[in-house]
Every structure is written in structure tokens, then in C-alpha cells.
């Protein structure tokens, strides 16, 4: 079994710390990947091997992806394809001679709405937690018994500022971890317009970071119960989102 972690450079630092702690405590040999964009070529991204000490923490892989493909958004989420799917498949191709191999995904029994049987069969995806009846409380109980945990709330998972997150999660993320939005601010400055000449707008409804900041100022910080009940619905679907690949 091989455990892969595709780093975008936009995760919360505690996410990287958590992966490293899992390596140390459970004895896992995690393969840390980052995308290697093939500029000037009509081919998907490759990969580079990193580790906890060398992993990008300032959005470098993401910025490199944007330089070639433009800024992704809810209508064109190519970030998942190039930052996660492509490096993982490229690594598998080098290791096993084929890009699509049997892959276990951590979707729980209470998240089966996220499972597409057709995609699962085509992509060789398996969902052991769902098959074993493991739900969110089971997962929480397991980590409560461990000497460490992720140490970040749900809304700061994946890329801290991800445009797939709901407004309430974005507002809470901005309030709790404002420095996480420095990267999309930077992207808006260096790429003020998209390839069609339109103003770069990362978030839903063609909004910018300034719009999200204004939303937080007007609405205030949302209570946690408005957020945690949403589960992982705005998660980054590494494989299941690309049924036709």
C-alpha cells in the first residue's frame, strides 16, 4: 500500500504537520507530491517529490498552475485536475506502468452521497470507511484516543481559502486565518484579468477577496453551528470529479 499526499502550497500549516505526525506515529512512508507544470507543452502536470521539510507553504505549486492555466473558479475547477489528480496519476504511471490503479478514498458511511458508482468502477476507487459503516463520530472517537490531532476546524481544511467553500465557511476562514487569503490577493494583483479579458474573480458570483472581506464586515463572524453541520460538502474531490478523464 502506498499513501500519497498532493500538496498545493495553500493548505493550513497544521495540515502538513498532521501528515508528518502520522508518518512518525504510525510509521507511514507518505509520498509527498507537488505538481510540476509542463509549460509550453500540451500535456498535464507531472510531479516532484518533496517532504515535510521541503513542502511549499506559500502557494508556489498553485501559482505555477495559474501561470499556465489561469485562475480556476467554480465553473472551471482545473486546480484539482492539475494540482492533485495529474501528479498522482503521473507518479502511479512511473511506479506501476499505469496511471489508474486501485485507490482507497476516505469517504465515510454518512457521506455516501459523494460516491458515484459509475466513476468508482471506472477509476478503480474503493471506499473502505463507507463499506465498514464508519461515520463521523467513529472518526472523532478514534482521534480522541490518539496523542495528536489535526488541530484545525473543518472550515480551514484543504486550501484554506478554497472557492468551493460556502460563504459561511469562507467568512469563518477569513476571520480565523486571514493570512490564508494573502495568496489569492496576490494572484488577483499579478493576474488582474483572465484569458478572456474579464476581471479575475475567484469566488462564486464573480467576487474577489475584497468582496469576501466586505461580506464578513457586514454579516459578522458566523456561529460554528452554521458551519460544522455542513460536513465535508465543499471538499476537494481528487478523483471522483473527473469521470471522463
Predicted features along the sequence, with ranges:
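Nucleotide-activated chemistry modules centered on ATP-dependent adenylation/adenylyltransferase
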Residues: 1-245
Amino acid at each position: 500500500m502506498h499513501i500519497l499526499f498532493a500538496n498545493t502550497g495553500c493548505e493550513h500549516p497544521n495540515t502538513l504537520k498532521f501528515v508528518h505526525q502520522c508518518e512518525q506515529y504510525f510509521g507511514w512512508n507518505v509520498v509527498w507530491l507537488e505538481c510540476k507544470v509542463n509549460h509550453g507543452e500540451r500535456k498535464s502536470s507531472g510531479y516532484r517529490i518533496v517532504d515535510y521539510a521541503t513542502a511549499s507553504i506559500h502557494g508556489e505549486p498553485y501559482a505555477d498552475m495559474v501561470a499556465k492555466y489561469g485562475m480556476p473558479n467554480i465553473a472551471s475547477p482545473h486546480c484539482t485536475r492539475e494540482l492533485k489528480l495529474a501528479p498522482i496519476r503521473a507518479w502511479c504511471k512511473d511506479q506501476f506502468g499505469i496511471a489508474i490503479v486501485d485507490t482507497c478514498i476516505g469517504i465515510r458511511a454518512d457521506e455516501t452521497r459523494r460516491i458515484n458508482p459509475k466513476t468508482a468502477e471506472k477509476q478503480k476507487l474503493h471506499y473502505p470507511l463507507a463499506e465498514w459503516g464508519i461515520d463521523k463520530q467513529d472518526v472523532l472517537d478514534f482521534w480522541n484516543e490518539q496523542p495528536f490531532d489535526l488541530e484545525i476546524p473543518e472550515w480551514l481544511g484543504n486550501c484554506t481559502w478554497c472557492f468551493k467553500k460556502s460563504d459561511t465557511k469562507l467568512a469563518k476562514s477569513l476571520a480565523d486565518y486571514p493570512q490564508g487569503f494573502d495568496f489569492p490577493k496576490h494572484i488577483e494583483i499579478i493576474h488582474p484579468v483572465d484569458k478572456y479579458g474579464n476581471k479575475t474573480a475567484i469566488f462564486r458570483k464573480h467576487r474577489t477577496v475584497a468582496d469576501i472581506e466586505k461580506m464578513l464586515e457586514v454579516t459578522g463572524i458566523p456561529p460554528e453551528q452554521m458551519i460544522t453541520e455542513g460536513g465535508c460538502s465543499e471538499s476537494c474531490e481528487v478523483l471522483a470529479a473527473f469521470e471522463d478523464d
